[in-house]
Amino acid sequence: MNLVELQDVSKNFGALKVTDAVSFAVPKGQALGIIGPNGAGKSTLFNLITGNFAPDAGRVTFLGQDVTRRPAMDRVRMGVGRSFQIPQPFEGLTVYENLAVAASFGRGRSEAAVTQDCIRILEDTELLRLANTQAGALSLLDRKRLELARAMATGPELLLLDEIAGGLTEGECQALIATIKRLHAQGMTIIWIEHVLHALTAVVERLLVLDFGRVIGIGAPDAIMASKEVREIYLGIEA
Amino acid sequence: MAYRVVTRTRTGSIAGVAAIVLIIVGFVLPAVAPRDMIQDLFTILTLLTLAQLWNLLAGYGGLVSVGQQAFVGIGAYAMFAGVILWGMDPVLAIPLGGLAALVLAVPTAFFAFRLQGAYFAIGTWVIAEVTRLLVAQWKALGGGTGTSLPREATSDIIGVEAIRSLFGVREAAARDILAYWLALTLAALTIAAIYWLLRNRLGLALAAVRDNTEAAKSVGVDARRIKWAVFLIAAFVTGLTGALIYVQTARISPDAAFSVTDWTAYVIFIVVIGGIGRLEGPILGVIVFYVLQSTLADYGAWYLLTLGLIAIAVMLFAPRGLWGLMSERTGLHLFPVQRRLLAIDPMSGQQPPKRGGPDDQ
């Protein structure tokens, strides 16, 4: 079963086609990586899936329902969780409170009902030791972890990760990959935008290449990385 | 290991008990205190209520309104209308003030919420001025020059007779005591309600919206609805406060009731120097404000200049206000709202969570 499906989705900013008739589907339990040069429209694609942008044409289906016109808030509650490219923690709240607000409002449950879930997610993302720390005082790695943890707290069926490995050192990156791998192994469906290719290929089953808003390739990572077109456009390697 | 979430602290419990004692003392105070002290306390308590509400708006809701005088004024005028036009008891007409402010808050929010930041502030101010100009056309309530509560309405306010015989005071003093008790009740209930709100899950949502509206929306918080709720609640109670202030004053004019200086600028001063975004801030702020006012009131323009300089100094050197400065140094929180995760260790009670990660830093 396809968890999320885009059919001929287009989005224009003025005369600029940022998303150009994009179609793809992600089956439940799969991890899809999205790569492409800066300005290819990757983050816009995310905003179309989360509902922050409405497409000019095409259809977005989530859990078998047409959500094209559904506002972002509804989609969070249906199970679309996202992390931001630049971590956006609630700085005045503690790490635990960041999760509590996401879990409580993302699932429409009382604070007490989500406490144990929040603790489990803190454990999974190795943030438990920082539970009572103010989010504004976290290091970059821990902010990235908090992005991931907070998205998880909303109880997502689909997890959208936007360049979550960017800016981390090699060691930190490995720690984060291990966490994401674990979540995926537990059955989480993931769409992941990333420039750090080895992080992506360590987790995802399929890669999608975006250029000028169009899908120029989708398939197994090995096949994609070997394709002439991708190497030319994305990696800038003369074939 | 099992964990539980705790908000309560020892200081918080002590502060809670102290607050209850203080409220009880406040209620019996008129038995011993002179009339001018009761009047001063009335002013302090109503300013404190207004400051707590503005703090809720700006410090928690991120809504920096410079138009709260609209709700003080409309609340006061609604109370006057109840008394003069419909022959109501002034005290019983106070709820009308809250309702009128609530009704005015709906179109105000509708327009002002389209504006962001400084534009929102100016927008609310403009709406307050427009309301003042409209109310000044209300001839039955004195138009631009204003009017007074009729003698027969103030002479038999509910409860005044009982207070007169209880304390053996004149009617005017008894009216002050009644107004003071109402102000004390309103201030205590306002602080208690805001405190409850902040400890509730709505408090978390408010903080999330204030810290990062986009991120709050992305985790399912309906930022728009929360801002509406906060704005309407603050308007309603501000309207009640306005009505109460003018029950005590018994004389109203559009310029006084819609004064941006008295009902918004001083209130912002109190919140900013006390500490924005904290319940303790306005309490400390109103005390500082009162001390400054009573020591500098005779110096005319110098008084306002001094207030301005102090506000600037606090904003530059203690952006979290005097209370912020104090609680940073001492770690003191009289009204704890932070949730803390504590491990329940079956052997030795509780201890904070400790766990080393592979990349402890």
Regions found by a protein language model. Name each.
Chain A
Residues 2-239:
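Glycine-rich phosphate-binding loops of nucleotide-dependent enzymes
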